[in-house]
Amino acid sequence: LTLALASTVSAGKSHDPKGVHLSFGSRDDEMVMTWTTRKDAGTDVRYGPGDAGGGAPADLAFNATGDVRKFVDYGEISSVRYVHVATLESLAPGRRYWYQVGDAKLGRWSKIFWFNARRTQEQYTEGPPLRIIALCDIGLKGSDSIVEFLTKEIHGNDVDDEINNVNPRVDALVQCGDFAYDLDDQNGQVGDKFMAKMEPIAAYVPWMTSAGNHEASHNFTHYAERFVMPDSRKTNNHYYSVDVGPVHLVAYNTEALFWPGSFGVEYIQRMYDWMDADLASVDRVKTPWVIVHGHRPMYCPQYRELTAEEAASGGSRRTLGEYVSGEYDDEEEEEEGVSFMMRGFRKYLRGTLGGKLKKKKKWRGGMCPWEQESSRKGIPSFCEAADGTSCAFNENAVFLEGARKVNYAWKFPIEDLFQKHGVDLAFYGHEHEYWRSFPVYDEKVVNGTEITLDRYFEPKGTVHVVTGAGGNANMDLGDDPPSRGVCQLKGGLKDASPWCAFQSGVDHGDSRSQEFAYGVVTFESASKMTWEHFSALDDGKRIDTWSIETASHGPFDARAYSADLGSADAIATER
């Protein structure tokens, strides 16, 4: 079977470009094309600007060349691919270009595609506004309906005529991790098929990415090889930023905290320092909106379920986050269920902090599981399974040695950077559902001038969204529709967290289906952005819409607000 799979590519097609996709370059006037072949071939592009109406030109009069690299898969047959990368430069802002990629000498070309060059700030202001598709966790299987609707977003309802039918302009597709399930499966052939499946979308609009846990195989090699993001040679596509009109888009590597075999604490320190400097450098007059994406979320829509022991002791929701904050009860040090990792962490903190730890007899309240705590506070951890379950502090010798090298830095509070620099929106995947938060910081809902369910006016904290319902074989398609609605109202989520505003597909099980959906973010102006969420289960029905409105940007503590209510009572939970 393995040999049969390896021979499915015929000799005549081995030089044909496959999985063509775009990404933004480091400069505003660039567009990067990436594709693969099964045999070594040239890296050529022929392209030309469209006519006055954007239609196809009479010929593709311009030529460009790029680089090719050999990629040997780590699977049992060491299958070979050639990854081709070409960058078009000096593109006219907002102009539509038509292009083909392939090998000019062999005459092996892809079909003809088009793309729109990045626009100037003035062009975005004139309209149409910047629109970004946001989704994560999309697999080769289970994603047919999602891919169909994404294709319609790009090409209009007549998907058979993807050249001439164009929906309202979509400027980018942003996917925050978990591709194909998995890119390396079947000696990389699952990844090949997935990239081909995404080509009707990603060959027309830039596909900007961040890595998830399903890319972890062999040190994230398939992710690093198949995609090319800005500054990819420095970071292997794991963290970068790019300006697109009014938006400063930042990708970061949430997986660095959970894979000690691939990323050490020195790496996390570099990424953390880079993010701090990058966010500080943003000109919030030129690019008022700061949007961040990664794979693992910082928050949960529901409190962690109580263990039997916790329920018997009075219902205190005790999480490993208690140990991170240094709050503990001496009498409970050796209690059953507290992992040796946590006990070791306690000793480590005592040594690091001079033996000064805050004591607290009883910890109460709701917190998320350790995985979210680790993501929010930036604490290097280890998970027993790739899906993130059973996570705990990573106290292995390699980490501790690395911590000493960076002055005993044992946590990298990424959420603090969001608050410090005024990150407006952060979206993630990992959980196969859709939910959004109220503006939140340090597990507290932070009001602005007016915060309602659908309108966040002058918020004082980052809004977090999980858009991990991209469709994959691990998702359940039940007989009944997903649970949808306001988190805290009657009939909403059991044990809903106070920061959870709206959800779809979180409370699944029995006969209920999970949600299969994607988001579209529109930046109407420097003072308003709107998120719309569409369900592929309901024939593209819009299931949620909400907006952030603020005329003041930058660090939340330094923003000029028109008023300051400052009370949780200002949160409205009715439409």
Regions found by a protein language model. Give the residues of each.
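N-terminal active-site segment of His-dependent metallophosphoesterases
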Residues: 15, 19, 25-32, 37-44, ...
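Hydrophobic core positions of the immunoglobulin-like beta-sandwich fold
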Residues: 88-89
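Short, conserved loop/helix-junction motifs that constitute active-site signature segments
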Residues: 198-204, 457-459
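Stable alpha-helical elements in mature extracytoplasmic
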Residues: 142-150, 175-176, 190-197, 219, ...
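Metal-dependent phosphoesterase/phosphodiesterase active-site architecture
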Residues: 8-44, 49-61, 67-73, 80-82, ...
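Active-site HxH/HxHxD metal-binding segment of metal-dependent hydrolases
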Residues: 204-213
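Cleavable N-terminal signal peptides of Sec/SRP-targeted secreted and luminal proteins
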Residues: 1-8
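Residue-level marker for buried hydrophobic side chains located in beta-strands
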Residues: 132-134, 173-175, 209, 292, ...
